[in-house]
Curated annotation (Swiss-Prot):
This is Aquaporin-4. The gene is AQP4. InterPro entries: Aquaporin-like, Aquaporin_transptr, MIP, MIP_CS. Glycans are attached at residues 153, 206. Keywords: Cell membrane, Cell projection, Disease variant, Endosome, Glycoprotein, Lipoprotein, Membrane, Palmitate, Phosphoprotein, Repeat, Transmembrane, Transmembrane helix, Transport. GO terms for molecular function: identical protein binding; water channel activity. PROSITE patterns: MIP. Phosphorylation by PKC at Ser-180 reduces conductance by 50%. Phosphorylation by PKG at Ser-111 in response to glutamate increases conductance by 40%.
Length: 323
């Protein structure tokens, strides 16, 4: 077979797919600090899932289940994430959530290459954390192992919207609390994020299980093999996170450099639009002038002897207008 089709296929992207360009795209990946950050995300997610999912175990078993303690679960999730952010924030940024990582990519805070490793580490940590919890919990009380599920009286669309909303408030809290441009933040950033997670749980546990974190739902789903409506816990949180990050970073509190670039782009576009508008107006004015010059007037029939216009009928019987 000829190598020509292969050459054609790679001809245009060949210069971009060189070893040097690939190394530039993954710049910073091959450093010790990078792998420390990835390991931190893995370990933080493992501990977070293990501790927080443990609060969902119903120790009454299937025969005599205890009432669900929403406050206990909410506080455990909130304080767990606050602790992990405080411990690992200076190492990896303390994302501990694929939705947060995607929002950071969309706001140009981390590279795509770094985000791929972060999300992989987070998902792997969630699986291992859920697996450890499954191993140390008596089979009679394992139950669903904290698998997130949409309430039976709600549709998938309702669940998607709830996850979008609670993740939006979480990620908006993260961006607002971690904004380096602010000088009024004096409290604990980790605690603010933890409270945001707790509030989301207090509101949405009965609706969707209050995930706000695709990896948190992914871990127990893998261990228990339960994938019912699992896509909701990826699509909803990611959309909510991207909306929150984009609104905060580009609308409410844009940085000085972004505002300068936006003004330049807007001014340039306005000038181009104004020039096109003036050109169209000039053409229209010329056409209207030509119409005034070339348009024939109305012929009037006037009786000079009587000094008045004739009103009557011509030979064809049509009325001659004096207007």
């Amino acid at each position: 077979m000829s190598d020509r089709p292969t050459a054609r296929r790679w001809g245009k992207c060949g210069p971009l797919c060189t070893r040097e360009n690939i190394m530039v795209a993954f710049k910073g990946v091959w450093t010790q600090a990078f792998w420390k950050a990835v390991t931190a995300e893995f370990l933080a997610m493992l501990i977070f899932v293990l501790l927080s999912l443990g609060s969902t175990i119903n120790w009454g078993g299937t025969e005599k289940p205890l009432p669900v303690d929403m406050v206990l679960i909410s506080l455990c999730f909130g304080l767990s994430i606050a602790t992990m952010v405080q411990c690992f924030g200076h190492i990896s940024g303390g994302h501990i959530n694929p939705a947060v990582t995607v929002a950071m990519v969309c706001t140009r805070k981390i590279s795509i290459a770094k985000s791929v490793f972060y999300i992989a580490a987070q998902c792997l940590g969630a699986i291992i954390g859920a697996g450890i919890l499954y191993l140390v919990t008596p089979p009679s009380v394992v139950g669903g192992l904290g698998v997130t599920m949409v309430h039976g009286n709600l549709t998938a669309g309702h669940g998607l919207l709830v996850e979008l909303i609670i993740t939006f408030q979480l990620v908006f809290t993260i961006f607002a609390s971690c904004d380096s441009k602010r000088t009024d933040v004096t409290g604990s950033i980790a605690l603010a994020i933890g409270f945001s997670v707790a509030i989301g749980h207090l509101f949405a546990i009965n609706y969707t299980g209050a995930s706000m974190n695709p990896a948190r739902s992914f871990g127990p789903a893998v261990i228990m093999g339960n994938w019912e409506n699992h896509w909701i816990y990826w699509v909803g949180p990611i959309i909510g996170a991207v909306l929150a990050g984009g609104l905060y970073e580009y609308v409410f509190c844009p940085d000085v450099e972004f505002k300068r670039r936006f003004k330049e782009a807007f001014s340039k576009a306005a000038q181009q639009t104004k020039g096109s508008y003036m050109e169209v107006e000039d053409n229209r004015s010329q056409v209207e002038t030509d119409d005034l010059i070339l348009k024939p007037g109305v012929v009037h029939v006037i009786d000079v002897d009587r000094g008045e216009e004739k009103k009557g009928k011509d030979q064809s019987g049509e009325v001659l207008s004096s207007v």
